[in-house]
Structures are given as structure tokens and as C-alpha cells.
Amino acid sequence: MSRLFVKRLPTGSFLMLLLYIGLLLSAIAVAYSTYWNRQLLNSLYSELSVRDKAQAEWGRLILEQSTWTAHSRIESLAVEQLRMRVPDPAEVRMVAP
């Protein structure tokens, strides 16, 4: 009696099942690769932001360094703090090597 209710599957059903499983796996792989791509892109933009901030800070530091080493600043500090002055020509003595 149990043979009456058993139907045989059409030919090619196993192949269709394999193709369906392959399709599902392919769809999951596409979704995962899209997710991973977005994660990497977010990480890239974050690193680019850090780089831009570091470059801006570097530019400010270079400008500050050039300000601190300017000749007019050094001369004014020497005159004001150390009371230095340019000697008169009569005060200059030549020393032989």
C-alpha cells in the first residue's frame, strides 16, 4: 500500500536541486562580499581622514618652526633678553689662525 503513494521524481530533479543550492550559495556570497566591501570602504575613509588631519598638523608645525627660527625673531630676542648688540668696527679684533 505504501507503494501507491510514492511518486518518482522527474528526471533532472537532482540537477535542479544542485543548481538551486548553488544559486543560494552564490546569492549569500554576493551579499557577504558587498558587506565586506562596505566595511573596507568605511575603514579606508577613516584612514584618509586621519591622514588629512596629520598633514594639516604637519603643515602647522612646519609654519611654527619657521616662525621660531626667523632671523628677525632671533635678533630681537638677542637684543631684548641677552642685551646683545652689533659691535662697533673699532671693537672688532681680527685673530690669526
UniProtKB/Swiss-Prot annotation:
Its main location: membrane. Residues 33-97 are periplasmic. It is found in: Cell inner membrane. It is a single-pass type II membrane protein. Residues 1-11 are cytoplasmic. It comes from the Bacteria. GO terms for cellular component: cell division site; plasma membrane. Pfam families: FtsL (PF04999). Keywords: Cell cycle, Cell division, Cell inner membrane, Cell membrane, Membrane, Transmembrane, Transmembrane helix. The chain crosses the membrane at residues 12-32. Part of a complex composed of FtsB, FtsL and FtsQ. Essential cell division protein. May link together the upstream cell division proteins, which are predominantly cytoplasmic, with the downstream cell division proteins, which are predominantly periplasmic. NCBIfam families: ftsL_broad. Belongs to the FtsL family. This is Cell division protein FtsL. It comes from Pseudomonas aeruginosa (strain ATCC 15692 / DSM 22644 / CIP 104116 / JCM 14847 / LMG 12228 / 1C / PRS 101 / PAO1).
